[in-house]
From Swiss-Prot:
Annotated source species: Arabis hirsuta
Claim: Ribosomal protein is one of the keywords in the record: yes
GO cellular component labels: chloroplast; ribonucleoprotein complex; ribosome
Major subcellular location class: plastid
Gene3D superfamilies associated with the record: Ribosomal protein S11
Keyword tRNA-binding: no
Pfam families the UniProt entry points to: Ribosomal_S11 (PF00411)
Secretion signal span: none
Subcellular location per the Swiss-Prot or TrEMBL entry: Plastid, Chloroplast
UniProt keyword list: Chloroplast, Plastid, Ribonucleoprotein, Ribosomal protein, RNA-binding, rRNA-binding
Name recorded for this polypeptide: Small ribosomal subunit protein uS11c
Length: 138
């Protein structure tokens, strides 16, 4: 019968405390990706490291309700609530995509109390690249 291999150290005791370290972030970048089906809001520091993120799907919206402006507003509020607690005062906003949640997410960001240095539209525009999807026939 084979003997079990004894482990010297236990993995449970290696890490004490939580992994997330709370650091003060005075300035950041808020990325809003608004597609027709969902809206994803990501808050990063100026170097691009993700601090907080939220989407309409993680806020509990399912199906076609994920693409609504109200879902985008809720997602933006959830993502920003965490960074306001960490002391973010100024941010720049980068909006990407053609979705309905663009304006609603921007409105929620303005209402949060963070000063916006500028709002930039970074939607990728093709120089006649891929063929677009066919028109819907309902």
């Amino acid at each position: 019968m084979a003997k079990p291999i004894l482990r010297i150290g236990s993995r449970k005791n290696t890490r004490s405390g939580s992994r997330k370290n709370v650091r003060r972030i005075p300035k950041g970048i808020i990325h809003v990706q608004a597609s027709f089906n969902n809206t994803i809001v990501t808050v990063t520091d100026v170097r691009g490291r993700v601090i907080s993120w939220s989407s309409a799907g993680t806020c509990g919206f399912r199906g076609t309700r994920r693409g609504t402006p109200f879902a985008a507003q809720t997602a933006a509020g959830n993502a920003i609530r965490a960074v306001v607690d960490q002391g973010m005062q100024r941010a720049e906003v980068r909006i990407k995509g053609p979705g309905l949640g663009r304006d609603a997410a921007l409105r929620a960001i303005r209402r949060s109390g963070i000063l916006l240095s500028f709002v930039r539209d970074v939607t990728p525009m093709p120089h006649n690249g891929c063929r677009p999807p066919k028109k819907r026939r309902v």
